[in-house]
Amino acid sequence: MPRVSAPLVLLPAWLLMVACSPHSLRIAAILDDPMECSRGERLSITLAKNRINRAPERLGKAKVEVDIFELLRDSEYETAETMCQILPKGVVAVLGPSSSPASSSIISNICGEKEVPHFKVAPEEFVRFQLQRFTTLNLHPSNTDISVAVAGILNFFNCTTACLICAKAECLLNLEKLLRQFLISKDTLSVRMLDDTRDPTPLLKEIRDDKTATIIIHANASMSHTILLKAAELGMVSAYYTYIFTNLEFSLQRMDSLVDDRVNILGFSIFNQSHAFFQEFSQSLNQSWQENCDHVPFTGPALSSALLFDAVYAVVTAVQELNRSQEIGVKPLSCGSAQIWQHGTSLMNYLRMVELEGLTGHIEFNSKGQRSNYALKILQFTRNGFQQIGQWHVAEGLSMDSRLYASNISDSLFNTTLVVTTILENPYLMLKGNHQEMEGNDRYEGFCVDMLKELAEILRFNYKIRLVGDGVYGVPEANGTWTGMVGELIARKADLAVAGLTITAEREKVIDFSKPFMTLGISILYRVHMGRRPGYFSFLDPFSPGVWLFMLLAYLAVSCVLFLVARLTPYEWYSPHPCAQGRCNLLVNQYSLGNSLWFPVGGFMQQGSTIAPRALSTRCVSGVWWAFTLIIISSYTANLAAFLTVQRMEVPIESVDDLADQTAIEYGTIHGGSSMTFFQNSRYQTYQRMWNYMYSKQPSVFVKSTEEGIARVLNSNYAFLLESTMNEYYRQRNCNLTQIGGLLDTKGYGIGMPVGSVFRDEFDLAILQLQENNRLEILKRKWWEGGKCPKEEDHRAKGLGMENIGGIFVVLICGLIVAIFMAMLEFLWTLRHSEASEVSVCQEMVTELRNIILCQDNIHPRRRRSGGLPPQPPVLEERRPRGTATLSNGKLCGAGEPDQLAQRLAQEAALVARGCTHIRVCPECRRFQGLRARPSPARSEESLEWDKTTNSSEPE
């Protein structure tokens, strides 16, 4: 059968002439709220009738008549009596009532018996058990469709827990689809029924205590508004609660009394504001209310009035189409007879085929007489009024405009003051030095304060910082409640928790977190255990005292062996006068006891000496000693760098396993913090063992704050388990603290918000923006760096101080003092055994000191023993020598006259030796060769004998 579509104003005159009266088409309307200052149902019927009758296309004088009957009570008797008054008038349809379910059921039964169409304009009651009459049509959307639409919204917002407030017990049957979805998905839906007092306050308090954030209100417009006002009084109208109204008159609610415009209130609307007559219809209602009422009861047309308006048009359209196929007539009926209207069934068939656009949108019915193929607009309350953010269609389902919804949330943050709960914790939040002179947010400083300023600048909101009452981050109690900042968020006492609040799975179940603004992990903080402080003789530290002792013994042993070997081997005995090889009976050994002690010293100091080993045995001793000193010096040099450039720490533990395997060092964490929860819930064997130790240790190893933990580390044998960021901060400011090992886990700090916070996505985007702009890293460097302790890499480049190598200067000074003292002893000893002099010892010493200061008198007579003769230069015999002579410095003295050569040689008094007759200078005895010297009278006979021996063998 083809669908029927007809304009509402094209009503031919012949259609109007088929009624029982040749001049009218009669429709009956039953109103249960006939007051002028109510929903405006009477006015809407009048407007529909007049608009149809004023249509210029209408021919003749026939017109539509609507008889209005008032129903004072929802009574079966009065309803039946009213119907008995309507049937004799010969009506083609009965409309209403709008708010009397019992009366509506009686009317449907009577109309069904007489086969007169009946239009309902109220939601069905007892949908599952009531038999829908064929003659009954319902313009009001079914509760089943509304239930499916609510379920779609809950799915869109990922709501896993919700509370359904019912004004009547029948709502459990009406919203069966919604209940079934929660049963299938295993989500939580609590149902609360209003009591007979109709006071929702106790019910709302229970919902608040249950921490339920999504509330579905299934009640009429008046009761829904009352519930919302009571919720506002309890502080439940905020950004952390979501209200969903199933009443289709949501757009008529007055929200002016709501203080917090951040509340997320959603509802449905079926009004078609694009309809050509909608504005005129609304203006007429408002004008009527203003003229006849003390106040305007609604902000727009009530749903029942719009449905009655559309019902009149639907009946007229169906009658028009029916009359095209057959002539219809209407005759009076009676309650006392079994007579029916013969055209009633045909008209019902045409009514089910009607399609038109009315004030409530598209009008179409299914085979059951229920409205179909329509759409519900989803509205959200904003500071600018109600805004459509999506729609639900019977066939297409839910479609939401996420951009509009997000923009409403962003706009709701504008110029909004958020309560921020936090805790004093360096460097996240600290009191300024002069905080007594300030008030409000100006009293605080720190990383979180700066980050809040950045976020407020991006999202354009205001904030008020408030310290948490109990001074803890938040842990669950045995009764299921939470303490600290987490507890305040759950109780909706704060909008944000901005601090070093760790994101954990347990906390995520009860509050929402933003994206992490800082990544960290648990670390071990322990005090620095330094070895003995560096002293002046710390250059001896590379070797232990035992090594130094064995080195001394090795030195003495080598000296003794060298002295012994040099005495035994014949190759270390040689003639002191190589010029007289084979003619001198004297042999000399250079390894005296003093030289044997000096030679190893020169090798050990890598300076060498003038003593060179001749024999293989002495060279073997020398080589072994040099190899020994090479290894010793190399080892000393390598170890000296480690000992003097880096202060070595003596740490008894190096990892978390070392800490868990011992009991001498106590360890613990902050009570009620995320680190404590980490160890408590960990399944790793080492961490479980650590938790058992911390939990059972008495006195308790847990601390209340980070400052208390730091003090305990410094003043006792205690290791503190805390976040790596705090570890880094305090190590920068106390050089006696160090981190042991690496991180025990990886986690992040986030901004806490109550469950269901509509600002979560906005803060996520703002945090990502700060990270991309590197603002968070800049803030961290600002508050973490600048400590008095240098970075660890700076220790390697630190110069050595006097406390490290001052001892070597002490050794040098002592050696110089000993050398001066020995020189004075030698000076005095020489003077005492020299020839008698008229000059005193003091004068001699003064003279030498003066020469030293003036750098003069490098040559002076040799001091001889008492009774000895003073040395005199040798007298050279004048004879013609060879043309040249080689001096001791390796230079050639020119040929010239013999006298000149002799005079030149005589000037080299220090190089002229006794008994030498050669002009060449001997490299061993440094004597001249080639000239014969006359012995002076003071020369002994032994010297003269030596001259004779040497001269007799020399060629002339």
Swiss-Prot record:
Designated name of the protein: Glutamate receptor ionotropic, kainate 4
CDD domains given in the database record: PBP2_iGluR_kainate_KA1 (cd13724)
Cellular-component GO terms for this entry: cell projection; hippocampal mossy fiber to CA3 synapse; kainate selective glutamate receptor complex; membrane; postsynaptic membrane; presynaptic membrane; synapse
Family note: Belongs to the glutamate-gated ion channel (TC 1.A.10.1) family. GRIK4 subfamily.
Compositionally biased intervals (Basic and acidic residues): 939-948
Annotated Pfam families: ANF_receptor (PF01094), Lig_chan (PF00060), Lig_chan-Glu_bd (PF10613)
SUPFAM superfamilies from the UniProt entry: Periplasmic binding protein-like I, Periplasmic binding protein-like II
